């Protein structure tokens, strides 16, 4: 496996292998440094806390080191250098690259010019495969991935984590329930592609009508930075919120996930309920990304 650009690059066996490795990696490499002498280049052209820091933590725990390019404003891209040329240059400095970029397809483009593995840390409204592996790993800690009912609520138009997760779940015969503000549902192309892959996708007008059927509720924030019209954001900014009163008749094993950052779509009073798994989900970023790094760098 040279690059991890899209969840489409992974079949079910590869996903299951990475998830299994994530569960074993901390013990497997305790006291060992399999990536000693290796350098991970972190090229983040959009803001990031969890993805950047968990990749860095994963690399350090494996004995390697990191080189952080920073944003466009501190790189030669501010002088007009192309992404392709930047990748060509950094390929000579590092042993793998994690790339986050605002343009859909940027990671795929980077892989065409890179001599070292590229891991997609999020490309605009496209995909976020490492987050999807974390999501699947977190779900699998409490239930089987097969045949689950999952609700995707929030900005499904621009939310790349929901796109990647929905595609991954086609390997597991999931029932995908979508709840989104008007105009922010799954793009038609993704909806149609999911159904072509055999997925059952059911659209709902409100979370109340489906919450009691769900095994997993995946909540996302509105992607304010991707709205072409800022006025549209304010029109829908308070259109959904998960509160304890919504959770009075849910399945006992319900897992509420959120890729974070949270704005106001989950009330903080939900945090201490047994259903809240989003901070555990964030912690899982380290072992999952350790598994990914050893997959492409060892």
Swiss-Prot record:
Pathway: Pyrimidine metabolism; UMP biosynthesis via de novo pathway; (S)-dihydroorotate from bicarbonate: step 2/3
Residues annotated for L-aspartate binding in this entry: 79, 160, 221
Gene3D superfamilies: Aspartate/ornithine carbamoyltransferase
Disulfide pattern: none
EC number(s) on file: 2.1.3.2
Superkingdom of the source species: Archaea
Family classification: Belongs to the aspartate/ornithine carbamoyltransferase superfamily. ATCase family.
Subunit structure: Heterooligomer of catalytic and regulatory chains.
Name of protein: Aspartate carbamoyltransferase catalytic subunit
Taxonomic source organism: Methanospirillum hungatei JF-1 (strain ATCC 27890 / DSM 864 / NBRC 100397 / JF-1)
